[in-house]
């Protein structure tokens, strides 16, 4: 009994009449679907990005050197982009996400601007800097998760005596895909302060809301800082009261307390504690995910590759790649991905082994 030829065999068997037909229709900007169907509609995800890790101990010196070459004012944002090795030149760490290491020197200001891209910050190194969002400042402490929602005025400054470094995460590739990017510079490098520090957290993040406040699940949170001290205390309490999930350890998602949805409509953020000696069972999901080690050390087996990580190291797990985490000591990981978009579109999947 004859069996149908697979795509490779079909490609190797060139039909002269078909090839001539393809050349004729090419001038009309036409192409035959049957020649590319397997690529367009794969049986499983085939991400272009690859697993990768950036050791902070290796890249920190380059981040610091950038501070001697260009000012924050001239650069607008002094950032070294973490480019996926398979996506070089695209300013992308996954197909839909951007990540970079931003540094601000003592006395500098990264001037106020706004854009349609949503941004998150995870503070890694140094003290004394602040971020201002729509008229309110927050002092940046290591591990703090800070949001600048789409189209909000924001600037950064360093009032301390040491450089401060944080991880930037943005949905730049997603906005680029939709061709919806807008950007404006403010007339003032430093925006005026309209509210005292901590106002948004008190107003929207204390199990209370203004009596007439209403918000849709698709809108970003009014809270723009999630202090690491609170996150760490919650993880510690949770780990003391319940066994770790076999696949995830003690993993929590950041939420907009007014809606229970993701703080950002296009990116989800997560905090994860792994007990010392803990190894997760193999797990994979469709959202390519960027991880940052905040505490501890261990290894990440991503597909058939294994990466050792330490504090401030960044690693990326591509879509549908099996992940196993090993914690040498008690470890805290921060991560972010495009899961909210996939879930809203009904595309997200996970698989636990």
Regions found by a protein language model. Name each.
Residues 105-142, 149-152, 157, 284-311:
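A short beta-strand-loop-beta hairpin characteristic of the jelly-roll/cupin
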Residues 3-21, 159-219, 224, 328-353:
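Double-stranded beta-helix
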Residues 133, 139-160, 166-171, 302, ...:
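Conserved metal-binding segment of the jelly-roll/cupin
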Residues 2-94, 191-266, 270:
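A short, N-terminal "cap"/entry segment at the start of jelly-roll beta-barrel domains
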Residues 260, 267-273, 283-286, 296, ...:
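C-terminal structured domain segments across diverse proteins
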Residues 102, 272, 315:
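Conserved GNAT-family N-acetyltransferase fold
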Residues 87-98, 105-119, 135, 259-268, ...:
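A short beta-loop-beta micro-motif enriched in histidine and acidic residues
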């Amino acid at each position: 009994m004859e069996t149908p030829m697979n795509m490779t065999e079909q490609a190797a068997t060139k039909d002269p009449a078909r090839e001539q037909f393809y050349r004729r229709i090419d001038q009309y900007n036409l192409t035959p679907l049957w020649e590319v169907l397997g690529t367009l509609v794969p049986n499983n995800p085939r991400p272009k990005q690859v697993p990768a890790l950036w050791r902070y101990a290796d890249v920190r010196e380059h981040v610091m050197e950038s501070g001697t070459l260009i000012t924050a004012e001239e650069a607008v944002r002094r950032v070294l982009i973490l480019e996926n090795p398979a996506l070089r030149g695209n300013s992308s760490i996954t197909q839909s996400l951007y990540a970079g290491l931003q540094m601000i020197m003592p006395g500098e200001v990264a001037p106020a601007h706004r854009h349609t891209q949503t941004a998150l910050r995870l503070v890694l190194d140094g003290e004394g800097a602040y971020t201002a969002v729509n008229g309110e400042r927050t002092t940046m402490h290591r591990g703090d998760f800070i949001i600048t929602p789409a189209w909000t005025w924001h600037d950064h400054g360093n009032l301390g005596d040491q450089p401060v470094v944080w991880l930037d995460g943005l949905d730049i590739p997603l906005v680029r895909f939709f061709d919806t990017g807008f950007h404006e510079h403010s007339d003032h490098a430093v925006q005026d302060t309209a509210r005292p520090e901590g106002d948004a957290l008190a107003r929207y993040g204390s199990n209370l809301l203004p009596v007439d406040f209403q918000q849709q699940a698709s809108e970003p949170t009014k809270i723009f800082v999630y202090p690491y001290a609170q996150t760490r205390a919650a993880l510690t309490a949770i780990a003391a009261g319940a066994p770790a999930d076999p696949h995830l350890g003690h993993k929590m998602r950041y939420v907009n307390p007014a809606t229970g949805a993701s703080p950002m409509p296009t990116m989800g953020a997560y905090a994860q504690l792994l007990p010392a000696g803990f190894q997760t069972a193999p797990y994979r999901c469709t959202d390519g995910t960027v991880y940052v080690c905040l505490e501890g050390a261990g290894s990440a087996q991503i597909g058939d590759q294994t990466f050792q990580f330490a504090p401030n190291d960044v690693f990326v797990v591509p879509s549908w790649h099996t992940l196993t985490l090993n914690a040498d000591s008690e470890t805290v990981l921060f991560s972010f991905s495009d899961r909210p978009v996939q879930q809203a579109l009904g595309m997200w999947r996970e698989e636990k082994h």
